[in-house]
Design a protein with these regions (language model features):
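Transmembrane beta-strand segments of Gram-negative outer membrane beta-barrel proteins
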Residues: 23-41, 72, 159
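Detector for outer-membrane/organellar transmembrane beta-barrel domains
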Residues: 195-197, 234-323
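Repeated loop/turn-to-beta-strand initiation elements of outer-membrane beta-barrel proteins
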Residues: 26, 64-70, 107-110, 158-161, ...
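Outer membrane beta-barrel
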Residues: 61-161, 166, 193, 353
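Residues on the lipid-exposed face of transmembrane beta-strands in outer-membrane beta-barrel proteins
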Residues: 54-60, 98-103, 149-153, 189-193, ...
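Transmembrane beta-strands of outer-membrane beta-barrel pores
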Residues: 34-40, 60, 74-80, 105-107, ...
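Outer-membrane beta-barrel "beta-signal"
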Residues: 342-343, 349-350, 366-380
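Residues that define the transmembrane beta-barrel architecture of outer-membrane proteins
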Residues: 46-54, 92-97, 143-147, 183-187, ...
Length: 380
């Protein structure tokens, strides 16, 4: 696999450096989960499935605080949907989940391979969700990684610089509407620095998009230069507050998809009630325009998320989204119970049958309407 060159190249550089190895560490762990989901609105009302993520992690400590480590994990899953015992549909897959090698010191790290890259100040509705698709309702917080090389340098004043090169990630990531041209690498970076009582950052990413799979022949291009700029800041005052924004511009006319503008404003606060009630409020505006910042017919969402620990091993939380354009509310509630190495999740929801939450349209096929899901997770 060509993507393994990222890992092999980094490993060769490290082991040819002549450093004496001080200590080795090998760790195996895994996560096994199973769920049962019932929603009478679906074509297949009853869904059941299982997933196993085995992970191996090797650490090779070197002198002077240097570390070389490798992580490899896989994602094995299967699902079956049932209308009746005689009418079912199923799917499953085995694929790499993470596969990277990293060289790090006290202030620097270089990581190559299949990895998760995410950043930003927003909590749930994230304009800077450029390379992942984390779902806030997912107890496992799973997301596919990207193939690439990431370098980070940390200054003593808590400022840091990120630089990355991605390659071989042709499927849409995050907020992307169009695939990436697989033959052209993507590049970008981020500068994060202290600001007042918090921190702020500026991010940039460049890729070459490929729109040849679109149905409109006039919008089909093999190579479309795309520039993406992001800004985020978070401050701890009486309440925690943040702003996060992203602007994406296509170098060719893609009609209403030529420009994309997304902005999030949010606050959080923990009330001194009982064991502590944490509340998050976010406001999101997203627009697609032929002209930059025209903001014609933007989608506007409000979100409130509350979490309350019922005890040492129980937690109750809910999320409410409100779609102002369609005047629709999405309601999720989740109870979590910890049993040593086992965790039980019970989730219920009441949603519109037309599911329009940004970046959750695929999940909408399952979570549209009213339903309940049970999930059991075993970590070893």
């Amino acid at each position: 696999m060509n993507r393994l060159k990222y890992i092999l190249l980094l490993a060769i550089l490290i082991f040819n450096s002549g450093e004496n190895i001080a200590q080795d560490f090998l760790n195996f762990k895994g996560q096994l989960s199973a769920y049962s989901h019932f929603n009478p609105n679906n074509d297949f009302p009853w869904w059941n499935g299982g997933r196993y993520i085995p992970e191996a992690h090797v650490e090779i400590s070197q002198k002077e605080g240097r570390l070389f480590d490798i992580e490899a994990s896989a994602n094995l899953y299967g699902n079956i949907g049932m209308e009746s015992f005689s009418h079912t549909v199923s799917n499953g897959k085995i694929k790499p989940y993470r596969m990277w090698a990293r060289y790090s010191t006290n202030q620097f790290e270089l990581r190559a391979g299949l990895q998760k890259i995410n950043f930003g100040s927003a909590s749930i509705l994230r304009p800077l969700m450029w390379f992942d698709q984390l779902d806030p309702r997912d107890p496992l917080q799973l997301t596919d990684g990207v193939w690439g090389l990431l370098g980070r340098y940390y200054f003593l004043n808590n400022a840091n610089i990120w630089l990355w090169i991605l390659h071989g990630n042709n499927n849409p990531k995050g907020w992307e509407m169009i695939k990436t041209n697989r033959s052209v690498p993507e590049v970008g970076g981020r500068i994060q620095f202290p600001a007042s009582t918090g921190e702020a950052a500026i991010s940039y990413h460049y890729r070459t998009a490929d729109s040849r799979t679109l149905s409109d022949a006039e919008l089909q291009f093999a190579k479309i230069p795309e520039h993406r700029v992001g800004f985020d800041a978070k401050f701890d005052w009486v309440v925690g507050c943040w702003v996060e924004a992203s602007w994406t511009n296509m170098g060719k006319s893609m009609e209403m998809f030529t420009n994309q503008e997304i902005i999030n404003l949010g606050v959080d606060y923990t009330f001194g009630l009982g064991n502590g009630l944490t509340v998050i409020y976010e406001q999101l505006l997203a627009a697609y325009d032929e002209k930059a910042f025209h903001l014609s017919r933007p989608a506007t969402f409000s979100l409130i998320n509350a979490s309350y620990p019922l005890g040492l091993f129980d937690n109750l939380s809910f999320i409410i989204y409100f779609d102002w354009r369609n005047k629709a509310a999405y309601n999720f509630i989740n109870w979590q119970k910890q049993f040593n190495m086992l965790t039980l999740y019970v989730m219920g929801y009441v949603n519109p049958k037309n599911y329009n939450i940004p970046l959750q349209q695929a999940a909408g096929n399952l979570f549209a309407g009213t339903g309940i899901q049970l999930m059991l997770v075993f970590n070893h």
